[in-house]
């Protein structure tokens, strides 16, 4: 669920998901349109695509099982939906960590009106 995703982000990046990732660029947070602004925003675009490929799942509310071992997120047992949601969230949290050095504070609370270009396809 979104709370678990937030905890993954915090552990991976050391940053609070709100406000650092909830309104970043064109794809972090609710919805998304246009072209991703940078590598961090692309993490959100890919995460949105990952959620979009799930069928009959509720990624924002379905809880899943995971742990961290030696700093690595391990998705645990559960339904196929729970496992897939966990893998989507894990990939995004790791992506955020890998792109911390290019994170731009100017893309926080980025206005949607500036995300007008045609959206990329997943």
From Swiss-Prot:
Which coenzymes or cofactors are required?
Ca(2+)
Q: Which Pfam families match?
A: Phospholip_A2_1
- The record's top EC class is hydrolase
Its subcellular locations are: Secreted
State if Metal-binding is listed as a keyword.
yes
Keyword terms: Blood coagulation cascade inhibiting toxin, Calcium, Disulfide bond, Hemostasis impairing toxin, Hydrolase, Lipid degradation, Lipid metabolism, Metal-binding, Secreted, Toxin
- What are the cysteine partners in each disulfide bond? 26-115, 28-44, 43-95, 49-122, 50-88, 57-81, 75-86
Q: A Gene Ontology CC term for this entry?
A: extracellular region
UniProt EC number: 3.1.1.4
User: What is known about the tissue distribution of this protein?
Assistant: Expressed by the venom gland.
Catalytic residues, per the record, are 47, 89
The Swiss-Prot or TrEMBL record annotates one GO molecular function as: calcium ion binding
* Cofactor binding comment, as recorded: Binds 1 Ca(2+) ion.
Q: Does the keyword Secreted apply?
A: yes
Positions annotated to bind Ca(2+): 27, 29, 31, 48
Q: Which reaction does it catalyse?
A: a 1,2-diacyl-sn-glycero-3-phosphocholine + H2O = a 1-acyl-sn-glycero-3-phosphocholine + a fatty acid + H(+)
Biological processes, Gene Ontology terms: arachidonate secretion; lipid catabolic process; negative regulation of T cell proliferation; phospholipid metabolic process
Q: Which domain of life is it from?
A: Eukaryota
Q: State the similarity comment.
A: Belongs to the phospholipase A2 family. Group II subfamily. D49 sub-subfamily.
Q: What does this protein do?
A: Snake venom phospholipase A2 (PLA2) that does not inhibit platelet aggregation. Exhibits cytotoxic and anticoagulant activity. Induces Ehrlich tumor growth but not angiogenesis. PLA2 catalyzes the calcium-dependent hydrolysis of the 2-acyl groups in 3-sn-phosphoglycerides.
Misc note: Displays 20 times higher phospholipase activity than blK-PLA2.
- Would you tell me the protein name for this molecule? Basic phospholipase A2
Mind giving the lineage of the organism this protein is from?
Eukaryota, Metazoa, Chordata, Craniata, Vertebrata
């Amino acid at each position: 669920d979104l709370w678990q995703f937030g905890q993954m982000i915090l552990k991976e990046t050391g940053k609070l998901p709100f406000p650092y990732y909830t309104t970043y660029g064109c794809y972090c947070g609710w919805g998304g349109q246009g072209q991703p602004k940078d590598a961090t925003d692309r993490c959100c675009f890919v995460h949105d695509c990952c959620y979009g490929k799930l069928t009959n799942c509720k990624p924002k509310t379905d809880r899943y099982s995971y742990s961290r071992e030696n700093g690595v997120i391990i998705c645990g047992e559960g339904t196929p939906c729970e496992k897939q949601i966990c893998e989507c969230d894990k990939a995004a949290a790791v992506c955020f960590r890998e792109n911390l050095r290019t994170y731009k504070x100017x893309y926080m609370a980025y206005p949607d009106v500036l995300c007008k270009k045609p959206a990329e396809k997943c």
